[in-house]
Structures are given as structure tokens and as C-alpha cells.
Amino acid sequence: MEIENHKEEVPFAHYEALFKELNPREVLERLPDVGFDGQAFQLTLLGRSFSVTYPGCEFTARDGGALPPLPTRTFLLRYLLESKRVPFGGEWKTFREMPWGEMYIKPYTGRVLTRAAFTFGTRVAAFMAAAEKMGAVPLGHGDAGYQFDLIGPYRMQIMVWEGDDEFPPNAQVLYSDNFAEGFAAEDRVVAGDILISTIKSYM
């Protein structure tokens, strides 16, 4: 296959090759939320279930809907390859408070915080309706705030504030504390990106 979109397809091809060498038993020991029927892994991301054939690496949406975009599929492969189950300790952390957060804060701010602020803070009612459709848990923070189950034991919260004549719209994203150990910093950025894109698709 000729690679045309290097930014998205080259990383996917890299992790696809690693995926084919996986030991399914080792994956199930690390990730008890993941299923395996001998032919495919089953995992759930933001309420949608997907199958990934092994070792073929063919993705299927179990609800019959559209497949997630390539960066999301890459994230799911990295989850299977590298993540592990870490219990939620009951605390919430900003991106900056977690390991390597300071180093990645600039791309994170642009891709996640600013994008969330201007995507949802300018359309708070639509954001609320989308979050409700996704089964998110409402929070008593911000002009609107919701908690989402991302994958396995990992959860995220988004709070948005509507802009006015004096202040631009604003947003805050919090991660369950187990992200600090369960995901690399770059995957935490991607997780925020995926959450925003998924909410937006329901608006």
C-alpha cells in the first residue's frame, strides 16, 4: 500500500506491525476490560464497542456504525500494546499535573483546551445535548460539565464556560488519576482530541 497521508498512516502501519506480534494472553492479563474470542479483541471506547481481528488487525464497529478515524484506531492499538489496568484512586488531575505534562502542554493546549473552549463554549446547549446522548454524567461545575468513561477504568471530565463581551469561552479537562500511570503523555493528548471529536460528532 502506498502511504499518502504520512502523518496518520505511518504511525498506524507501525503499530499494526507490532499488533500482529502480540500475545493475546498477555493483553488479557494487563487489560481485563478487553475481550478475546480467539479471533478478535473486543474493546469499548466512549460507549461504542469495536472488534479488532487478530492477527489481521481489521476493525469493525459492533453497532454497525462508522469506523473511527485512523488516529483513533492507532490509539486503540497503542492501548492494546502498551496500556494496563490501573485502579482509579478517586482524584482528578489536569494534564499539566501528570508526568511529562509540562513538556507537552503547548500542543495539548491547542489541540484540547482551546479547541474544547471554542467548540463547546460557543454552543453550550448543543454540547449538553451531545453529552446527554452519549450517556455522560452531568457535573456541577462550569456553565456545563460532564464526566465520560473513555476506555476501561479511565475517565475524563470536561467543563466549559460560555464567553461574553469581556472574556472568551473557556474549558477545562480533567483526567482520572490512573491516566498518570496507564498512558504516556502523548496518548493523554490524543485521548482529549478523541473525546472532543466524538462529542462534536453528536452535536
Predicted segments with their positions:
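Intrinsically disordered, low-complexity regulatory segments enriched in Ser/Thr/Pro
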Residues: 48-74, 161-186
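Amphipathic, interaction-prone secondary-structure segments
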Residues: 27-55, 137-162
